[in-house]
UniProtKB/Swiss-Prot annotation:
Modified residues (Phosphoserine): 223, 226
Name of the molecule in the record: Electron transfer flavoprotein subunit beta
GO cellular component, one term: mitochondrial matrix
Keyword Lipid biosynthesis: no
Comment field on protein domains: The recognition loop recognizes a hydrophobic patch at the surface of interacting dehydrogenases and acts as a static anchor at the interface.
Organism (species): Sus scrofa (Pig)
Subcellular compartments: Mitochondrion matrix
Alphabetical GO biological process terms: amino acid catabolic process; fatty acid beta-oxidation using acyl-CoA dehydrogenase; respiratory electron transport chain
Classification via Pfam families: ETF
CDD domains named in the record: ETF_beta
Length: 255
């Protein structure tokens, strides 16, 4: 029986199908009354952890999320997918908007040490901020090896083999556990939570703690200056011939 334990980070984000609206004061995007769901890359990380457990390579899968009370819904989704228990690091909604990769990485590192896990899995990035920094920072705080953008994960005794896609093809890394791995899109296809598993998830434990309980200061060192909609695309003009194209480019001062 495997004795390895995995910690999986899950983030609550605005659903990918929702059209984002910027607040009138440009301090952020509208969050109230908007559908939220688990970050798609986090779903992939949960799926991979559960698959490792199903192969009896991992003993326990712990799902963790930082944010307001609604984050427990995201944790419940992870539990319905097969995670064993959850940890909610509660952050008031007013403060949660300022959570960045640095603060979350500090929390994950402390939890990894507290729970004595062997593997930290998380999505390579979140679709709301696209930072792609949390996994790397977590590994840095823990001084653990890291495998980012994983398209295949294989546990081999006290090591984990990570295959990752790079511009020139595939790169294979072999990391000594404990380690941090971030999931890429091609790692797996996440399962849908079935109704029976959703019902079972309601009975699974979610521990609620504060960042202060871990000795972590969530004060952000960054401030958002402005959030704006992308500029509207100007309609193009069709031209029939090369000569017309050259004339048009000259007209607008491009040549």
């Amino acid at each position: 029986m495997a004795e390895l334990r995995a910690l999986v980070a899950v983030k609550r984000v605005i659903d990918f199908a929702v059209k984002i609206r910027v607040k009138p004061d440009r301090t952020g995007v509208v969050m109230d009354g908007v559908k939220h769901s688990m970050n798609p890359f986090c779903e992939i990380a949960v799926e991979e952890a559960v698959r490792l457990k199903e192969k009896k390579l991992v003993k326990e899968v712990i799902a963790v999320s930082c944010g307001p009370a609604q984050c427990q819904e995201t944790i419940r989704t992870a539990l319905a997918m097969g995670a064993d228990r959850g940890i909610h690091v509660e952050v008031p909604a007013a403060e949660a908007h300022h959570l960045g990769p640095l603060q979350v990485a500090r929390v994950l590192a402390k939890l990894a040490q507290k729970e004595k896990v062997d593997l930290v899995l998380l999505g390579k990035q979140a679709i709301d901020d696209d930072c792609n920094q949390t996994g790397q920072m977590t590994a840095g705080f823990l001084d653990w090896p890291q495998g980012t953008f994983a398209s295949q994960v294989t546990l081999e005794g006290d090591k984990v083999k990570v295959e990752r896609e790079i511009d020139g093809g595939l790169e294979t890394l072999r990391l000594k556990l404990p380690a941090v791995v971030t999931a890429d899109l091609r790692l797996n296809e996440p399962r849908y939570a079935t109704l029976p598993n959703i019902m079972k998830a309601k009975k699974k434990k979610i521990e609620v703690i504060k960042a202060g309980d871990l000795g972590v200061d969530l004060t952000s060192k960054l401030s958002v200056v402005s959030v704006e909609d992308p500029p509207q695309r100007v309609a193009g003009v069709k031209v029939e011939t090369t000569e017309d194209l050259v004339a048009k480019l000259r007209e607008i001062g491009r040549i």
